[in-house]
């Protein structure tokens, strides 16, 4: 009789839904370690704007793939995927439970679905041309260009995510093949349980606004200024993301702090809506109401089912 495959638990959900607190409870209950699945937590020095788990939280449970590179270093999806699979194997070898936690849907899908990611080196000259086109013609025109050559990728990529649109165009330019065809699926040898935390939208928005207000009290603007003064420019992928780009008009004297904060709240609401589209497509997904106080007990009931029973390996 073939031995069951080891179990991977994934915790997903929109920003501010409560993933961090729940993941710490679950990891402690299951003798687990956490693998961060967040494209922004890899950057050192970007702590407040990314809502990075605090040093105290990281001391409670070991976390992997946090503070991996400096904000000006490139960290591709392929690099992340390889590092995450290595972290999962390391956790399993210690007879502990790997728990994937994060809100970057593309990264989570790449792990759980086993994407075969094309190794295409960046063409910075080509990227600059596309960026210039986006600036002059608008992001919708660039997305329409992708729609023509790769409708499947265009459907999956938000038109406002110019960086991802450009990457898809770049891959087609360099290989002559659509990125959607190159991203083949080779599911990893794990059993998967995906826990999707949800809250009513009005409550989630209120929590987002409270989080942004907390970030301001913790010194988010000072963190952004420190990064700029260290030479990390606004054009970097790390600095053009949520929580940082909103303060560029303040730095340039074009908007007040209050206007930038309002924009950050608005952008985070929009981001939270988009996250759900990724999570709904993930394998073996179970929706959980994050308001319930017995979440841990609910998950332990799921884990009591034979198909979800944790199995540790020592290979």
Curated annotation (Swiss-Prot):
The keyword Magnesium applies. Substrate binds at residues 15-20. The keyword Zinc-finger does not apply. SUPFAM superfamilies: P-loop containing nucleoside triphosphate hydrolases (SSF52540). Keywords: ATP-binding, Magnesium, Nucleotide-binding, Transferase, tRNA processing. It catalyses: adenosine(37) in tRNA + dimethylallyl diphosphate = N(6)-dimethylallyladenosine(37) in tRNA + diphosphate. InterPro entries: Dimethylallyltransferase, IPT, P-loop_NTPase. Residues 38-41 are annotated as: Interaction with substrate tRNA. Its cofactor is Mg(2+). Disulfide bonds: none annotated. The record marks 104, 127 as: Interaction with substrate tRNA. GO terms for biological process: tRNA modification. Pfam families: IPPT (PF01715). Its EC number is 2.5.1.75. Gene3D superfamilies: 1.10.20.140, P-loop containing nucleotide triphosphate hydrolases. One of its GO terms (molecular function) is ATP binding. ATP binds at residues 13-20. Belongs to the IPP transferase family. Catalyzes the transfer of a dimethylallyl group onto the adenine at position 37 in tRNAs that read codons beginning with uridine, leading to the formation of N6-(dimethylallyl)adenosine (i(6)A). Monomer. HAMAP family: IPP_trans. This is tRNA dimethylallyltransferase.
